[in-house]
Structure formats: structure tokens, C-alpha cells
């Protein structure tokens, strides 16, 4: 009886041809099969890892987006028609939420409840470039339903919605997005990235803001940074303060978006959690919008754009508002008309 089997590789019958009893040296056929099998397994593993990473990224985005606080700020009857480009109203409030009792004492924030505007900036991006304009809180402007008063009074009277309405009517520019952060969120963001380096020209001391800084370049902690952007203890008071606020926010955004922070999970994760947990945006805004805003501010701080304050015309006082400042109507109109038309801002209206 012929018990030989055809060799599947050569077709020649041989007693040892059956694969299970093949004693001949490996000629590479089985090795090729094993290598191809290993490659397929590694391919499936890499594909599975890629799918997991994509799902984590998507899940992380929606989780962080859900942490944003939201409030209707852009919905009121009779709004201005849309204007070209994209416009953000960026507000720093004096909300103490998120600060411990000891922090309130250390940072000299007081115990006031609620929130009031401590800084306001208009960020415009479009074909005419990117422009960041400080709106001093002591600006004397008409507030719908409340006569004329300081700009920050609009927030006190009616929150973000009335503030947006007041800014739109004072500038003629339609606001597309709103972002607000309080004291606690600001301190947390600065500390999450390990502080922000600033170069101080001369010593700064202001007990009312919990500030005591020496001259020179130094890394400011969250508490020191809060005092730095709050203090009005200088010759030009609020006008000096808005300059420092633009300067510091630019440095904060620049460091937050640097590879040293984004690629370091011990920095990027606390920053993302702290930022999204403390930012308040309009109920139509999302994390992607906020990321675009921060990227635009990063460009401005890097010199790719214009930073300025509304041209100031003078000062005054009234029983209702107390001391206030007024805008230079001619120059302010030129500034806002340029932004409203999405054109480059004339150099003659840029103030430093």
C-alpha cells in the first residue's frame, strides 16, 4: 500500500511529505507564513489602538465641552445686523467662586458676593487682521434703560446680556461670542501651567490688590498675577491696568498653547480641567469656539495683529457714576468703523 503523501509544495509523493511528519529542513515557506501572520496581528493591534485613541479624543472633547458654564448673553430683541469678521467680548469678572477663605485673605479680594466686571476686551478677527481692544470699565456710555453710566455698571444692572447690548450699541459692532472668567479660574489657570513670566519695570506694591512685586523679570504665581492685573495703584489708574491686562493675558495664552504645556500631561490636563470648569460662555458657544479665540489671542500677543485701548478723550464725574472717563468720539468712531467693516485699523487711532 502506497502510504506516501504528495508534498503540497512540490507535488512529489514522499512518506515524509505529510505536513505533520515533515522532518525536512524548513525551506522558508512556513517562516513566510508566520511572518505574514505576525504582520497582520500587529496591523490589527495598531488599528485597535488608533480607534481607541480617536474615541478617547472625541470623548475627551465632549467631556471638556460639557464642563463649560453657559448663560444666554447674545439673545435680545432688536440686535444689530451681522458685521463682517468674528467678534468676541472677553470679560474678566471679580467673582470669588473657586477661591478658598485663605486665598481670599491672601489675595485681598474681599468677601463680596456675586460678580462684577473687572476687565473687558473686544477681540476682532477677520480679513482686516486681528485686533484686541481694551474697553476701560470706567468708560462713560449710554446703557439701555439706565441712562449714561460707567461701562461696568451695565453688567451690574443686567449681567452679560445687558453688557453685550451696551457694547454693541456703543461700538456699532455685533458680538458673535462671549467668554467670561472669574478670579478663581484665573488663578487656577496660571498655577496649572506653572506661572507666567513677566518683566516688571519698577517695584509694584498695592495692599488693596494683595500685590508686592520687585522690579525685574520673574515668574508670577496665580495669586501674584491676579494682583498684577487688578491693581490700579499707578499714575493712569484704570488705563495702566488695561494695558497690563492685555499684556498678561497675551503671555498667559502664549504659554498655555506652547509645546512645553500641551505635550506635558501634568500641565495640559490640569489646565484643560481648570479652564473649562471656570469659563462661562454664551449658550451657543462650544470648546472649539473657545480654542479659536485663544489661538487668535496668541497671535496678537506674538505681534500678529493690533492691541490697543479705545482712544480716550477726557474725564468727568456725575452723582450717579462718580468719576469716569470719556472716549475720543472721532478716533473711537474711526477705530470701530474699521472693525465693523473688517478693515485694518488706522495707525492714528492706536494707543499704547
Q: Can you describe what each PLM-predicted range is?
A:
Residues 2-352:
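Non-catalytic, solvent-exposed segments at the cell envelope interface
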Amino acid at each position: 500500500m502506497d502510504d506516501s503523501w504528495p508534498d503540497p509544495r512540490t507535488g512529489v509523493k514522499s512518506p515524509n511529505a505529510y505536513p505533520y511528519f515533515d522532518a525536512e529542513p524548513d525551506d522558508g515557506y512556513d517562516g513566510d507564513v508566520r511572518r505574514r501572520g505576525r504582520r497582520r496581528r500587529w496591523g490589527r493591534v495598531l488599528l485597535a489602538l488608533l480607534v481607541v485613541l480617536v474615541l478617547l479624543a472625541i470623548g475627551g472633547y465632549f467631556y471638556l465641552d460639557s464642563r463649560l458654564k453657559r448663560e444666554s448673553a447674545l439673545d435680545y430683541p432688536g440686535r444689530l445686523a451681522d458685521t463682517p469678521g468674528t467678534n468676541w467680548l472677553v470679560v474678566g469678572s471679580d467673582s470669588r467662586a473657586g477661591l478658598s477663605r485663605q486665598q481670599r485673605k491672601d489675595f485681598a479680594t474681599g468677601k463680596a458676593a456675586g460678580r462684577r466686571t473687572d476687565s473687558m476686551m473686544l477681540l476682532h478677527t477677520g480679513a482686516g487682521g486681528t485686533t484686541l481692544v481694551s474697553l476701560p470699565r470706567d468708560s462713560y456710555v449710554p446703557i439701555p434703560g439706565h441712562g449714561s453710566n460707567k461701562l461696568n455698571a451695565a453688567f451690574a444692572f443686567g449681567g452679560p446680556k445687558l453688557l453685550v447690548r451696551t457694547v454693541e450699541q456703543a461700538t456699532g459692532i455685533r458680538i458673535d461670542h462671549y467668554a467670561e472668567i472669574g478670579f478663581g479660574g484665573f488663578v487656577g489657570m496660571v498655577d496649572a501651567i506653572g506661572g507666567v513670566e513677566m518683566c516688571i519695570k519698577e517695584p509694584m506694591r498695592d495692599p488693596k490688590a494683595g500685590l508686592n512685586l520687585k522690579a525685574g523679570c520673574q515668574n508670577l504665581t496665580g495669586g501674584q498675577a491676579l494682583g498684577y492685573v487688578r491693581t490700579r495703584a499707578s499714575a493712569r489708574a484704570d488705563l495702566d491696568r488695561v494695558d497690563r491686562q492685555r499684556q498678561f493675558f497675551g503671555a498667559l495664552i502664549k504659554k498655555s498653547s506652547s509645546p512645553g504645556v500641551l505635550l506635558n500631561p501634568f500641565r495640559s490636563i490640569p489646565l484643560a480641567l481648570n479652564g473649562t470648569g471656570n469659563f462661562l460662555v454664551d449658550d451657543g458657544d462650544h470648546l472649539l469656539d473657545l480654542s479659536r479665540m485663544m489661538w487668535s489671542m496668541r497671535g496678537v500677543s506674538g505681534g500678529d495683529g493690533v492691541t490697543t485701548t479705545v482712544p480716550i478723550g477726557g474725564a468727568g464725574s456725575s452723582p450717579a457714576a462718580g468719576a469716569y472717563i470719556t472716549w475720543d468720539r472721532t478716533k473711537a468712531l474711526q477705530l470701530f468703523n474699521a472693525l465693523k467693516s473688517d478693515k485694518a485699523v488706522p495707525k492714528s487711532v492706536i494707543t499704547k
